[in-house]
Amino acid sequence: MSAYLFLLMLVLIGVISNNQSVIIASSVLLIIKAIGFGDQLFPTLASKGISWGVTIITIAVLVPIATGDIGFKELWNSIKGPVGIVAFASGMFVAIAAGQGVQLMRVDPVVTTALLAGTILAVGFMKGIPVGPLVGAGIAALILGGYQVIEKWF
């Protein structure tokens, strides 16, 4: 019963914060659970959902290449200036951090729970978008790695 209440609360948070992603995700999960398909679908969604989501985001990002709006010339011109260099480096950093984050989420369930809570709060009330768990886990992994290095010194 608490799962239903939690999901309903997330739908309400989504409505209050006008966050369509939270409304849709929470509603879909609530419906799947209510019609009795949770046991069949939740394990697959849990194990493959992030990968599917990353694939969909990647498709959306690559659409300008597919339409011809961005080609090699535009790509090269975009990374020549300071803003482009910072954006390029940031993209690399976030991708590397997210990769580390996926690994951390696999080995430490406590991290996943804390990240989920932070993501729900940020998405629900601060206009965030729910890519936070991957990036958040990546940043956490980098910080924890730095902490472990410092801890060895002292």
Swiss-Prot record:
InterPro entries: UPF0756_TM (IPR007382). It is found in: Cell membrane. Signal peptide: none annotated. The chain crosses the membrane at residues 5-25, 52-72, 82-102, 107-127, 129-149. It is a multi-pass membrane protein. Keywords: Cell membrane, Membrane, Transmembrane, Transmembrane helix. GO terms for cellular component: plasma membrane. HAMAP family: UPF0756. Belongs to the UPF0756 family. This is UPF0756 membrane protein EAT1b_0668. It comes from Exiguobacterium sp. (strain ATCC BAA-1283 / AT1b).
